[in-house]
Curated annotation (Swiss-Prot):
Protein's name in the database: Uncharacterized protein MJ1650
Pfam families according to UniProt: NMD3
An MF annotation (GO) of this entry: ribosomal large subunit binding
Gene Ontology terms: cellular component: cytoplasm
Matching PANTHER family: 60S RIBOSOMAL EXPORT PROTEIN NMD3, NONSENSE-MEDIATED MRNA DECAY PROTEIN 3
Organism: Methanocaldococcus jannaschii (strain ATCC 43067 / DSM 2661 / JAL-1 / JCM 10045 / NBRC 100440)
Coiled-coil boundaries: none
Amino acid sequence: MIMVNLRIINFIGDIMKIRGICYRCGAEDELIDGLCPICYAQEHPLIEVPDRVEIEVCHMCGSYKRKIWQTPKSEEAFEILNEIAYYATKDAIKKKSVMVEVEIYPEVTQLPGGKRSKLIIPVHIVARGRLPGEKEDRTYEKDIEVHLRMVQCPRCSRFMSNYYEATLQVRAMNRYLTEEEREELDNFVREELAKRLKKDRMAFIAKFIPQKEGLDYQLGSVGAARNVAQRIKEKYGGKITETATLVGVDRDSGKELYRVTVSVRVPEYKVGDVVEYKDKYYLVTAITEDKVYMKSIDYKREKIGLAWHIAEKETKMAKKKDELDTATVIATTPTIMVMDDKSYEVYEFDNIGDVKIKEGDKVKIFKKEGVSYLVNKIEGKDKQ
């Protein structure tokens, strides 16, 4: 398609070329629209661009407005200004032919001073190529000025006015978050929002509200709240719920405006904990985004998987992993016998195929209402 277009351009150019006297300088040469090549080049630059270009730049975050507000690719001040001047110039240039290539050279020498400051960036432009009817490429150079108009972008304006579209609630099922979980989850939320900001300029925290139950974040973007909640669920497991509250009507469109609350509840328990489900006790063996996987600690060693909406309602914590008693194996045949490491009581269990142990191994045991259960063998980093 491009080759066809170039042939058409060259054909039109050949028609335009007639040898004669240039009406501008009087030289005899091949004429293009009545002008010799030199005069034609002077009358017809390769590009059109104004001497002064203006662009809006946010004095708070450094974003700049093209068709929409753009976040700079760099974090270094001079590189940001180079980027702004480059795109301001590029958007203002109108090429006169597809055979023209343009190079843009911003010349940043100073930094802006603040909200009401003015900054002018000189820019040198080099265009190379030719117009229809010209035999050879030529070069056209021009110096312009890019004027930065310091304003406050919509995002920062909303941020400064505590604007928010959604509340992200981080909770735990059937209990409060521990201090350790609060710190870990808060760091995770902030890291995920920092990543999200590169795609969603409204993914800022308008307000952080610690609650006794967990953590609340008022966010500038509903999408950010949903995205971070999903990332928490992917990493820790759990359940997400969403509600919306009518807060008003848009003046321009008449559409109803809602604030959304996205609640993510991480599991009550972790891998290695013992939980109760339908009057039986289970060892938590795996936690995924959608389910919790467990194994009964009786002689059957039944394996099951529960969706989180079921697990939240029908299971409860029986004993945390770190709170289980430990014991030492003193015999393995015909039954397994262990001695409690604290009370020195001896307990006897049936030999269970999926628990491969030998004398001297450390195991965890669970005691409830006079009944003892062999939970699992202590291995790896769990060894004391």
